[in-house]
């Protein structure tokens, strides 16, 4: 439904991270006349690898920006929910030899569930965040989620698990602005975060040495690196540290093309490797997905065509989607795709609209399951 009330009658809670995107989101809403409250979420209790408590620094920046804008602010703590719903899943997936996407789960369970419920308990009409995505309320009562205008920053890939009910209460104030314009707005407004660099770490955990961090929670089990023919090429540090298509960190010398991770043999604790970026073993023609979510409540046909992304910032691939009787979804690619990775998200699009997504579970080539992939 299109919003008809005057902005001054609408209360919006903004999830503020201490970064420039959420700062500008709050600033724009305030400029547009909404009643705005800034809330900082603390979901992880730790210091980064330099001994700095990044959450404290980030909250200090939130306070500065909220004072500059002239809005109330406070912090909420969802550490237990984050551990139970996101981090436990993250570790379980790595244990199973897969490569999880914690940002997708964090958006589903924390930002747009626990935090959205908290915002609603404060009498908020909407929760706003600094995501690069757009909301379209102009249709037939259903809300659509569209790609962000800045194609390089579009974050609908990470928002694929949001439901119609969640989207009805969400605003993305910077979704129709390019990143460089967001920086410009922040600088012109004199916001404290205008020149702060973007974070690139794990959702809420921050930037740190990934191997060191993961080894605190999961014991590493070194083993052999082998070719598909069983030739031992060296040792790996633990299967959880590697992902499909990875080149760096293998330490295999010699002549010829670079070496890449082709798969994992979990039973033997072997990392499968091969030469060449376009190694045939890296390519597949279809996948099966689980935990599919569709943003619309309308019934889907049993088969339909659309486009898909299998990783963030990837160009769309035309696909055929088939809903199977057992609840799984089979997705066939128009042409073979490289390094489809179990545990990662597959996200579906109809033009500009993100129509949903799920988790890659099994990978196939010419209808034959690739057992070495996951």
From Swiss-Prot:
ATP binds at residues 15-22, 41, 130. Keywords: ATP-binding, Cytoplasm, Disulfide bond, Nucleotide-binding, RNA-binding, Transferase, tRNA processing, tRNA-binding. It is an enzyme of class 2 (transferase). GO terms for molecular function: ATP binding; tRNA binding; tRNA-uridine 2-sulfurtransferase activity. InterPro entries: MnmA-like, MnmA-like_C, MnmA-like_central, MnmA-like_central_sf, Rossmann-like_a/b/a_fold. Residues 101-103 are annotated as: Interaction with target base in tRNA. The active site is at residues 106, 203. It catalyses: S-sulfanyl-L-cysteinyl-[protein] + uridine(34) in tRNA + AH2 + ATP = 2-thiouridine(34) in tRNA + L-cysteinyl-[protein] + A + AMP + diphosphate + H(+). SUPFAM superfamilies: Adenine nucleotide alpha hydrolases-like (SSF52402). It is found in: Cytoplasm. Catalyzes the 2-thiolation of uridine at the wobble position (U34) of tRNA, leading to the formation of s(2)U34. Belongs to the MnmA/TRMU family. This is tRNA-specific 2-thiouridylase MnmA. It comes from Lysinibacillus sphaericus (strain C3-41).
């Amino acid at each position: 439904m299109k919003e008809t009330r005057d902005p001054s009658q609408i209360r919006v809670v903004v999830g503020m991270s201490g970064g420039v995107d959420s700062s500008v989101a709050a600033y724009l809403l305030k400029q547009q006349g909404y009643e705005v409250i800034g809330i900082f979420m603390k979901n992880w209790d730790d210091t980064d690898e330099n001994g700095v408590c990044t959450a404290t620094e980030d909250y200090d920046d939130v306070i500065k920006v909220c004072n500059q804008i002239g809005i109330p602010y406070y912090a909420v703590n969802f550490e237990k929910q984050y551990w139970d719903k996101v981090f436990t899943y993250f570790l379980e997936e790595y244990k199973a030899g897969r490569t999880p996407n914690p940002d997708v789960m964090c958006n589903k369970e924390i930002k747009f569930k626990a935090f959205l419920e908290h915002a609603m308990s404060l009498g908020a009409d909407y929760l706003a965040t600094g995501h690069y995505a757009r909301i379209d309320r102009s249709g037939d009562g259903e809300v659509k989620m569209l790609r962000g205008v800045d194609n390089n920053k579009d974050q609908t890939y990470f928002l694929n698990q949001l439901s119609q009910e969640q989207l009805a209460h969400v605003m993305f104030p910077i979704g129709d602005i390019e990143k460089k314009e967001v920086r410009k707005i922040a600088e012109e407004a004199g916001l404290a975060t205008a020149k702060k660099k973007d974070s690139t770490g794990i959702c809420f955990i921050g930037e740190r040495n990934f191997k060191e961090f993961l080894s605190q929670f999961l014991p590493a089990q070194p083993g052999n690196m082998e070719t598909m023919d069983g030739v031992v090429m060296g040792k790996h540090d633990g299967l959880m540290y590697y992902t499909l298509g990875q080149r760096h960190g293998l330490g295999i010398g010699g002549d010829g093309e670079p070496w890449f991770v082709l798969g994992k043999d979990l039973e033997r604790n072997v990392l499968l490797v091969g030469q060449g970026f376009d190694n045939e073993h890296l390519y597949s023609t279809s996948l099966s997905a689980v935990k599919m979510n569709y943003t619309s409540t309308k019934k889907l046909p049993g088969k339909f065509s659309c486009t898909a992304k299998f990783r963030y910032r990837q160009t769309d691939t035309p696909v055929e989607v088939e809903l199977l009787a057992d609840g799984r979804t089979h997705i066939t690619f128009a042409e073979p795709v490289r390094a489809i990775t179990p545990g990662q998200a597959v996200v579906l699009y109809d033009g500009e609209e993100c129509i949903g997504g799920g988790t890659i579970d099994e990978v196939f080539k010419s209808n034959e399951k690739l057992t070495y992939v996951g």
